[in-house]
Amino acid sequence: MPNDIRVLLLGGTGRTGGRVLARLLERGVEVRAIVRSARRLEPGTANDTRLTAVEADPLSLPRDELLELVRGCDAVVSCLGHNTDLGGIFGPPRDLVARMTRRACGAVAVLRPAEPVKFVLMSSVSVNRPDRLDTRRGAIERAAVALLRGLVPPAKDNQDAADFLCSEIGQADRFVRWVAVRPDTLVEGDGSGYALHEGLVSSLARPDKTSMANVARFMCELVTDPRAWDEWAGRMPVIVDAAVSV
């Protein structure tokens, strides 16, 4: 039941992370959230007794403190990302998402939980599945994405985080199971409905839209609904708003 679930949320004040936090609390989930500034939490969220907010730079958090935050959690949800200004795109840390993914999964491995911990990563459609499984992406588009990763550090960071989950955690890890959620172009909106796909459903030239509310809803479903988790564990679903899915 949701009120028996404990989650560590990485990034709880961003546009998507804030929505994930609010939804988890609405469902009765106990949340430990690492945030850069607790002042950015919504008043109704900040005062919730089920929330423990820790102000910290996640990459600078001491190992022992991270272990204590992970200890006893059923899931770790990462909504970390880079700011969209020049400093956020090209400034340090360029490997925020990938390095924190490694740190969190490493902490789980040290703790050796009796049951695998769920790791839910907010990723992007610019991220490729391994071994060219995204067959809709042709050679030209793959080249464009590779160029993007070479020029724009957040694109490489997102790919590195997903590659770590696919290649190093894999499908048979004893302590971590994972899902990498790949939204298309993120937009505001109430998130009236969404569609999930195994692979890409649009091209870079004609992207679909994904409301941040829908991303938050699906990520929370993965945490609280065993059926959703069993369907998508170890996979990289693409999520788009239902009205624009193909």
Task: Go through the PLM ranges and name each one.
Residues 2-27:
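N-terminal Rossmann NAD(P)H-binding glycine-rich loop of SDR-like oxidoreductase domains
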Residues 162-188:
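Conserved beta-loop-beta element that borders a ligand/cofactor-binding pocket
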Residues 87, 91, 102-152:
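Conserved Rossmann-fold NAD(P)-dependent oxidoreductase catalytic core, especially the SDR/UDP-sugar
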Residues 10, 34, 79-80, 119-125, ...:
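SDR active-site strand-loop-helix element
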Residues 129-133, 190-195, 224-234:
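Glycine/proline-rich active-site loop of Rossmann-fold NAD(P)-dependent oxidoreductases
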Residues 14-15, 203-246:
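Mid/C-terminal beta-alpha module of Rossmann-like enzyme folds, strongest
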Residues 6, 74-75, 118:
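Structural motif
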Residues 33, 39-103, 110:
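NAD(P)H-binding glycine-rich loop region in Rossmannoid oxidoreductase-like domains
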